[in-house]
Amino acid sequence: MTPTIFISAGEASGELYGALLASSLRQHFAPKGQRAELIGMGGPRMAAAGVECVVRSEDMAVMGFTEIVLHLPRIYREFRKLKRAIRARRPTVAVLIDFPEIHFRLAREFHRLGIPVIYFVSPQLWAWKQHRIRLVRRFVQRMLVIFPFEEKFYRERGIEAEFVGHPLADLPPPSVTHEEFARGAAQINQDQWNYGPYSTTGLPAGTRPINGEIHDELDPHKQWIALLPGSRMPEILSNLKGMIDAAALLGNEYEYIIPLAPTLTEKQIAAIQYDLGDRILAGIEHPPRITFVRDARAALFHARASVVASGTATVEAALIGNPFVVVYRVSRLTYAIARRLVKVSYVAMANLIAGKCVVPELIQNDFTATNIVQHLRQLLPEGPARESMKMELGAIRKALHVHPAAGRGNHLGAIETVAAIIIREIEAAYPAAQEAAQP
């Protein structure tokens, strides 16, 4: 028999990890001509890696308390589709990647069916909703965490947890040169889902240029500033205006690059461009020069500095090591509720890992163009502020690796470590797969 592995991710970062994990699992089975069936929820990268995506992650990805309520009918419809697939296919093991709003409910379903659950990338229970610990204790067999302090948090609460390192910390720096990225002539790391500058000519029919200020190519002789508004439509539309206002205030001495999450559809990209033109750039006398790109890592690597919406992208920015400013804005109701529930001093993971304010955080009312520009003007030129942040970010990168010399882990990267743990779970649950599943 062929083992069936359920892999589920709901956001752009988790979807990347799901795709890398799917590829690693296939490599485990391939040498002896065996295979595993991979099903779950994901996006284009997971599908390209061989996962049969029963539900598309973009159909479930919403944010905030009020936003979730607005999309409940669609969420319930897609959730029922997932449950039907789980009952019909009866996976050997389930791997749930972050996205707790959906995955805790799925974990309950797997528990009912006697299917072991491995949770990869912990929900931020140490920050809020600690009552969900009981759900982890009841429905999750193994918690695999990507931040070092999370292992202690779970073990102190009687939950088996292991720090496997951060997947992004294992990636080499982007190999594309500044000039190549400017031309959009190279695909980063040979990944079929990463691209250079995103051409507006690839948008659906009827999409128009925006004020003449969206370009398909960057000027390699100017310094670039990356603007990362998020990976989901509501947060992108919420964060983009403040970022563009800051770019206009800073001026055309710089060019501005906006990486678009690979989980976004062409229709969503077109909607973002319309919003940019009709709502944002239309009111700016001297609009900044903007280029959309597909590869966030290369954008962060080649940008002189970045403005990054709070989320996984802040980890990516910290690992790249160039200075950045963290921003975020949600609805007033969402923010009011979050202030009562969140129990940490910082929102940026770089600051949480460091235990101090390494990167500036501009949240809600502090998220203004003036404040962004004030911080960027300190970080863009060579000087103490820039060098101090780069040094602190280097220390954070080291903290996100598992070091064999310290008696922890091995020489595998985070994804390979997770794959090996999944294989062992399959061997325990499905002895007939042991020979086929040997690494």
Annotate the PLM regions.
Residues 1-439:
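Nucleotide-activated sugar donor-binding and catalytic core shared by glycosyltransferases
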